[in-house]
């Protein structure tokens, strides 16, 4: 047997082994490996969204902590001027605005405030009926000016009867904060009285 024949047989053997390797069946472990690779790819794609959601939640919590929680005095100031509003309406708007002035301006513009989740106009009507019933049991209806003894602060121009209060000022002690809130309440009552008088004058002029 010459060398060319031996080389030819060797080439055929190598080609046969190579073809057997190509047509060999895929091992059963390979699909599992593909599934794991796909699962890892999906998890990696979801991580940025989870991170963004976490960051937005953190920012939202930080904004809420940055705003002052509305106190009962702040709610009372708004409710004395707008008694038809529920405490839930007032509290929710104060949590958003953080300011009695902004809440009152929104009420003056729209005539109402949004209801909090779980509360509706039926709740407001029920509370209004209770309020009207309790007021009817009183011997004499109480005027806000008389209730808070503001007659001495009403002058020719009602808005000048009380000093302006710095909106950014917040007392360091409980007594100082209570005093500032009382002054703010008096200021809002006098301003509301002045606006009502102006509206009545405009209606009479028309």
Curated annotation (Swiss-Prot):
Topology relative to the membrane: Single-pass membrane protein
Any one GO CC term of the record: endoplasmic reticulum membrane
InterPro entries assigned to the protein according to its UniProt record, in alphabetical order: CUE
UniProt signal peptide: none
The keyword Ribosomal protein is assigned to this record: no
Residue stretches spanning the membrane: 6-26
Biased composition (Low complexity): 41-63
Cytoplasmic side, ranges: 27-206
CDD domains: CUE_Cue1p_like
Disordered as annotated region, ranges: 41-73, 111-179
Subcellular location: Endoplasmic reticulum membrane
Primary localization: endoplasmic reticulum
Domain CUE: 70-113
Keywords, in A-Z order: Endoplasmic reticulum, Membrane, Transmembrane, Transmembrane helix, Ubl conjugation pathway
Gene3D superfamilies reported in the protein's UniProt record: DNA helicase RuvA subunit, C-terminal domain
Biased composition (Basic and acidic residues): 130-158, 166-179
GO MF term list: ubiquitin binding
Quaternary structure annotation from Swiss-Prot or TrEMBL: Forms a heterodimer with UBC7.
Function field: Component of the endoplasmic reticulum-associated protein degradation (ERAD) pathway. Recruits the soluble ubiquitin-conjugating enzyme UBC7 to the cytoplasmic face of the endoplasmic reticulum membrane where it functions in degradation of misfolded or regulated proteins localized in the endoplasmic reticulum (ER) lumen or membrane via the ubiquitin-proteasome system.
Family to which this protein belongs: Belongs to the CUE1 family.
Protein name from the UniProt record: Coupling of ubiquitin conjugation to ER degradation protein 1
Organism: Debaryomyces hansenii (strain ATCC 36239 / CBS 767 / BCRC 21394 / JCM 1990 / NBRC 0083 / IGC 2968)
């Amino acid at each position: 047997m010459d060398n060319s024949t031996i080389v030819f047989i060797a080439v055929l053997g190598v080609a046969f082994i190579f073809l057997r390797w190509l047509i060999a069946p895929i091992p059963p472990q390979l699909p599992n490996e593909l599934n794991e690779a796909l699962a890892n790819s999906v998890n990696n794609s979801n991580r940025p969204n989870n991170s963004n959601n976490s960051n937005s939640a953190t920012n939202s919590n930080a904004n809420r902590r940055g705003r002052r929680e509305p106190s009962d005095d702040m709610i009372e100031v708004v409710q004395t001027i707008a008694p038809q509003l529920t405490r839930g309406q007032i509290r929710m708007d104060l949590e958003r605005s953080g300011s009695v002035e902004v809440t009152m301006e929104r009420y003056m513009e729209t005539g109402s405030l949004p209801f909090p989740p779980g509360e509706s106009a039926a709740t407001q009507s029920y509370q209004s009926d209770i309020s009207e019933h309790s007021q009817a049991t009183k011997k004499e209806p109480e005027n806000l000016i008389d209730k808070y003894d503001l007659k001495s602060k009403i002058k020719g121009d009602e808005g000048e009867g009380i000093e302006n209060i710095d909106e950014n000022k917040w007392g360091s002690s409980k007594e100082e904060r209570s005093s500032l809130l009382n002054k703010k309440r008096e200021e809002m009552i006098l301003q509301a009285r002045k606006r009502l008088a102006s509206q009545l004058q405009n209606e009479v002029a028309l």
